[in-house]
C-alpha cells in the first residue's frame, strides 16, 4: 500500500498528464483549465484577471508556449510553500 507521500506524488503526476494529454506538456489553455478545476479558490481570489497569463509567463522559461512537468512541479511547490507559510502563521495565532 502506498504511503501518503507516494500517493501525493502519484496524484501530482496523474493530474499533470490528465491535463497535458499525449503531448506531454501544458499549453496556456491547459494550465487555465487545470487551475480552474484543481485550484478554484486560488483563481477566484486573484484580483488580477491576467493571473494565468502571468503564471504561464513565469513557468514557460523556453518561451515556446509549453509548460513541462518540471515547471508544473515548481508551481505546485511554490503554492505549497505559500500555503505552509499561511498555515504556520495561523497555527501560531491559534496557539496564543
From Swiss-Prot:
Residues 60-71 are annotated as: Ancestral calcium site. It comes from the Eukaryota. CDD domains: S-100A10. One of its GO terms (cellular component) is cytoplasm. Gene3D superfamilies: EF-hand. Keywords: Acetylation, Isopeptide bond, Ubl conjugation. One of its GO terms (molecular function) is calcium-dependent protein binding. The modification N6-acetyllysine is found at residues 23, 28, 37, 54, 57. InterPro entries: EF-hand-dom_pair (IPR011992), S100-A10 (IPR028476), S100/CaBP7/8-like_CS (IPR001751), S100_Ca-bd_sub (IPR013787). There is a cross-link at residue 37 (Glycyl lysine isopeptide (Lys-Gly) (interchain with G-Cter in SUMO2)). SMART domains: S_100. The keyword Acetylation applies. The keyword Acetylation applies. Does not appear to bind calcium. Contains 2 ancestral calcium site related to EF-hand domains that have lost their ability to bind calcium. Heterotetramer containing 2 light chains of S100A10/p11 and 2 heavy chains of ANXA2/p36. Interacts with SCN10A. Interacts with TASOR. Because S100A10 induces the dimerization of ANXA2/p36, it may function as a regulator of protein phosphorylation in that the ANXA2 monomer is the preferred target (in vitro) of tyrosine-specific kinase. This is Protein S100-A10. The lineage of its organism: Eukaryota, Metazoa, Chordata, Craniata, Vertebrata.
Amino acid at each position: 500500500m502506498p504511503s501518503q507521500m507516494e500517493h501525493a506524488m502519484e496524484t501530482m503526476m496523474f493530474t499533470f498528464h490528465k491535463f497535458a494529454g499525449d503531448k506531454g506538456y501544458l499549453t496556456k489553455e491547459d494550465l487555465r483549465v487545470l487551475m480552474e478545476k484543481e485550484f478554484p479558490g486560488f483563481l477566484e481570489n486573484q484580483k488580477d484577471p491576467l493571473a494565468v497569463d502571468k503564471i504561464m509567463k513565469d513557468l514557460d522559461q523556453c518561451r515556446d508556449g509549453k509548460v513541462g512537468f518540471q515547471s508544473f512541479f515548481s508551481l505546485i511547490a511554490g503554492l505549497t510553500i505559500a500555503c505552509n507559510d499561511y498555515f504556520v502563521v495561523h497555527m501560531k495565532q491559534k496557539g496564543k
